Amino acid sequence: MSNLVPMVVEQTSKGERSYDIFSRLLKDRIIMLSGEVNDVTANLVVAQLLFLESEDPDKDIHLYINSPGGSITSGMAIYDTMQYIKPDVSTICIGMAASMGAFLLSSGAKGKRFALPNAEIMIHQPLGGFQGQATDIDIHAKRILKIKDKLNQILSENTNQPLEKIKVDVERDYFMEASEAVEYGLIDKVIERK
């Protein structure tokens, strides 16, 4: 399977211009986060967020998410940038937002977190696998527990759920349909049409 990116041709008073589809969407302040959250995708999303802020710091940015999750540090780079920039970041789940994808979905501007009707959202605790000397494993175990506490605290703030409920719910994969994610507080509304 090839990774062809569609091109869009626009007619303007200055002539014809072609864009790849993602560049064209960026003109409308739309960023796509699809696939695994890793350093490459995080760098692209962060760069686009910063670019759009520089273009217009008062206009909302729309982050569409279809992601199974991925790296915590990469996801936190996106999260921190979403909080750092001036424009509100509206989040929209298309398909699935799981793990770090769900965390980012819930971290959009309050009142501007959405999912399409058949989207699926899943939260769980951080995953980690380490090997090496016992002392190194102990260091990594303490670190992942610290990260787990931080993520739980932010999820509690994002959802208005008690921290104790979050701790229980993330112990295992917790799947929700879009309407259930509204009740839980991960998103604000299920949208069917623009």
Curated annotation (Swiss-Prot):
The active site is at 99 (nucleophile), 124. It comes from the Bacteria. The keyword Flavoprotein does not apply. InterPro entries: ClpP, ClpP/crotonase-like_dom_sf, ClpP/TepA, ClpP_His_AS, ClpP_Ser_AS. GO terms for cellular component: cytoplasm; endopeptidase Clp complex. It is found in: Cytoplasm. Signal peptide: none annotated. One of its GO terms (biological process) is protein quality control for misfolded or incompletely synthesized proteins. CDD domains: S14_ClpP_2. GO terms for molecular function: ATP-dependent peptidase activity; ATPase binding; serine-type endopeptidase activity. It holds the Pfam family CLP_protease. Its EC number is 3.4.21.92. Its main location: cytoplasm. It catalyses: Hydrolysis of proteins to small peptides in the presence of ATP and magnesium. alpha-casein is the usual test substrate. In the absence of ATP, only oligopeptides shorter than five residues are hydrolyzed (such as succinyl-Leu-Tyr-|-NHMec, and Leu-Tyr-Leu-|-Tyr-Trp, in which cleavage of the -Tyr-|-Leu- and -Tyr-|-Trp bonds also occurs). Keywords: Cytoplasm, Hydrolase, Protease, Serine protease. SUPFAM superfamilies: ClpP/crotonase (SSF52096). Fourteen ClpP subunits assemble into 2 heptameric rings which stack back to back to give a disk-like structure with a central cavity, resembling the structure of eukaryotic proteasomes. Belongs to the peptidase S14 family. Cleaves peptides in various proteins in a process that requires ATP hydrolysis. Has a chymotrypsin-like activity. Plays a major role in the degradation of misfolded proteins. This is ATP-dependent Clp protease proteolytic subunit.
